Amino acid sequence: MTELVYEQPLNEKIRSYLRLEYLDKQLQSNLNHDHQHRCFYPLFSLCELSERCDYRNEVLKDIERHLLQLSKWQELDHVDHQQIDLYINALTQAREPLQKPERFGSQLKQDRFISALRQRFGMPGACCNFDLPQLHYWLAKPWEEKQQDYRSWIAHFEPLLTPITLLLQLTRSTAHYDNAVAHAGFYQGDSAQALALVRVKVDASHGCYPTISGHKNRFAIHFVQFEQQRHSDRSIDFLLATCA
């Protein structure tokens, strides 16, 4: 069996970042494989999230905070200065496009093809060729042309998604996995340091999955048996990382 990783955000900011990362991974998958009309679902979800909230200020604050921390680490001995320099350069480059006032994805509102599709995609079964003949035409295009179109649409969100990827990488790198045991399927942890993310790695052969709850200083993990859909009463060995 394989080891599965489960992540639980402990604040709203990381929750938003993880949702954006999830959509970004779907977008990248659609660039490599022809998923037909399904490729539009993550694109339209990203459009909606970007319209609801302008993440720019929050991301810029996070970039500045990490740059300050990385600069302090540069002065220490016994650290990987090359890796720190790579992150500083990447964050500095990712910061520049965020200075522009334009809202992410706003230009797609002017795209008549995208706008027509988006209105229909929220309706069950409304992607038939008699509802959206323009979609039927687009889907029949050669894969290379569709790929080029899709890449141009995604590009409107890269100024947001690129720094999100970097910030989550840095968050995850703050903790390594340690061995842990959930006695009777339950584990509770606490931390004097404010936590942002709990990561659980568990072997699928256990036949269970974790449900994680908590806040920045305390969290609880219940393991649930998948087949019975009830809390496990067995001791479960797993790996745990608590990221700040």
Curated annotation (Swiss-Prot):
> Can you tell me which residues the record assigns to a coiled coil?
none
Q: Which InterPro entries does the record match to this protein?
A: ZapD (IPR009777), ZapD_C (IPR027462), ZapD_sf (IPR036268)
Q: What is its main location?
A: cytoplasm
Q: Determine the domain of life of the protein's source.
A: Bacteria
Query: Which is a Gene Ontology cellular component entry for this protein?
Result: cell division site
The listed locations are: Cytoplasm
For this protein, the record's SUPFAM superfamilies field holds: YacF-like
- Does the record bear Phosphoprotein in its keywords? no
Keyword Cell division in the entry? The reply is yes
Provide this UniProt record's keywords sorted from A to Z.
Cell cycle, Cell division, Cytoplasm, Septation
Q: GO terms for biological process? A: division septum assembly; FtsZ-dependent cytokinesis
Q: Kindly name one Pfam family recorded for this protein.
A: ZapD
Q: Which residues cross the membrane?
A: none
Q: Which HAMAP family match?
A: ZapD
Query: What task does this protein carry out?
Result: Cell division factor that enhances FtsZ-ring assembly. Directly interacts with FtsZ and promotes bundling of FtsZ protofilaments, with a reduction in FtsZ GTPase activity.
The family classification in the record reads: Belongs to the ZapD family.
Quaternary data: Interacts with FtsZ.
What name is this protein filed under?
Cell division protein ZapD
Q: Which organism is it from?
A: Shewanella baltica (strain OS185)
